[in-house]
Regions:
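Short acidic capping loops at alpha-helix termini that bridge into adjacent secondary structure
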Residues: 179-180, 210-214, 264-271
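Alpha-helical recognition/docking segments in bacterial nutrient-uptake
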Residues: 60-171, 175, 235, 349
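Flexible loop/turn connectors
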Residues: 229-349
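Hinge/beta->alpha junction and helix N-cap segments in small-molecule ligand-binding domains
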Residues: 67-76, 94-103, 148, 157-168, ...
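Short beta-strand segments enriched in small/hydrophobic residues
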Residues: 15-20, 54-70, 172, 180-186
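N-terminal helix-turn-helix DNA-binding module of bacterial transcription factors
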Residues: 1-60, 348-349
Length: 349
């Protein structure tokens, strides 16, 4: 394997000049720089990353932790983050915690020992446990929270306006004539709590009764939980005519359950998701509350870059606005359609 001395010998220059080119230091002529770059290419020279980090006091490496790579929301956000850091010549290391504290600790320690200069974390349960927080704070590197709802006061964060997004979704269903609206979400989830807040506020704003028996929480936000919870809701009386789901993945499970029961969508039941990760790739296409995933990733990466460049201000929390995307999985409630057909005023609010 070629060394920096081999590059210097091939270029006919000093080791100091080669080092200056590698570290983007000023004072090297364009002719000398081209000689060094040509020698590097001919020798396939690859600088020792650790040595460079020590000499420059910088590794140009950041880390990002997500709770799941199966949930399509997170890969889309990761791509946005990675694009920003690539443009700024940083390497992005990705860790999948699976929502587990031990995995979070392993990745934090590994990334920091591997010279990560900063971290982006999701504001999910495992990242806010005492031992994890202690490791993050003792690391003395900038940390930015992204998505999730468990804001950590010491760190910058980019979060969605979950209550408003849920309010808009449920209010839309109410305007379609739905009175019995179910909700499926996740136990011990702060995001579920905030989306339930918006759900309840919309019902209150319309003067409708909150029916706790139509609210069901599962153990995870996976498709299987959406399927199981929807099956259970179908046995409730009154049976809901619309269902608001914690995310699109759970909504896919709900769609499967309804198809299995031969319940027509949206004629007999409307389905509405949240995050807009799968809305265009199912049948019928899913009405969903879209989160600006690319924007969220860009903002989080930009916040971290600012900290890496020395920005020293109090932690900043940026709240992004969701947007309701109307597709084919929602429609008027049956009684609402009958009133419209008769030419009567069907508005509830």
């Amino acid at each position: 394997m070629a060394t920096i001395r081999d590059v210097a010998r091939r270029a006919g220059l000093s080791v100091a000049t080669v080092s200056a080119v590698l570290n983007d230091k000023p004072g090297v002529s364009e002719r000398s720089e081209q000689k060094v770059l040509q020698a590097i290419k001919e020798l396939d020279y690859r600088p020792n990353r650790v040595a460079r980090a020590l000499s420059r006091n910088s590794s140009n490496t950041v880390g990002m932790l997500v709770p799941s790579v199966d949930n399509p929301f997170f890969p889309q956000v990761v791509k946005s983050v990675e694009d920003v850091f690539f443009e700024n010549r940083y390497v992005t290391l990705i860790g999948n915690t699976e929502g587990k504290t031990d995995r979070a600790l392993y990745y934090i320690r590994s990334m920091l020992s591997g010279w990560a200069e900063g971290l982006i974390i999701t504001l999910t349960w495992e990242m806010t446990q005492p031992e994890v927080l202690d490791n993050l704070k003792r690391a003395r590197v900038p940390v930015v929270g992204l998505a999730g709802a468990r804001i950590i006061s010491d760190f910058d964060a980019v979060v969605p306006d979950d209550p408003q997004g849920a309010f808009d979704a449920v209010y839309y269903l109410i305007n379609l004539g739905h009175r019995n609206i179910g909700f499926i979400g996740v136990q011990d989830s702060q995001s579920t709590t905030l989306r339930l807040e918006g759900y309840r506020n919309a019902l209150k704003a319309a003067g409708l009764t909150i029916q706790d028996e139509l609210i069901m929480l599962g153990r995870s936000y996976e498709k299987a939980d959406g399927y199981i919870l929807t099956k259970a809701l179908l046995r409730r009386r009154p049976r809901p005519t619309a269902l608001f789901c914690y995310n699109d993945v759970m909504a896919l499970g709900a769609l499967s359950a309804l198809h299995e029961e031969n319940i027509r969508i949206p004629e007999e039941m409307s389905i509405l998701g949240f995050d807009d990760t799968a809305g265009s790739y199912c049948y019928p296409q899913l009405t969903s509350v879209a989160l600006p995933k690319t924007e969220m990733g860009f903002l989080a990466a930009s916040l971290l870059l600012d900290r890496l460049k020395g920005k020293d201000t109090p932690p900043e929390v940026i709240t992004v606005k969701p947007r309701l995307i109307i597709r084919d999985s929602t429609g008027p409630a049956a009684h609402h359609s009958e009133l419209v057909a008769k030419g009567e005023n069907a508005s509830l609010i």
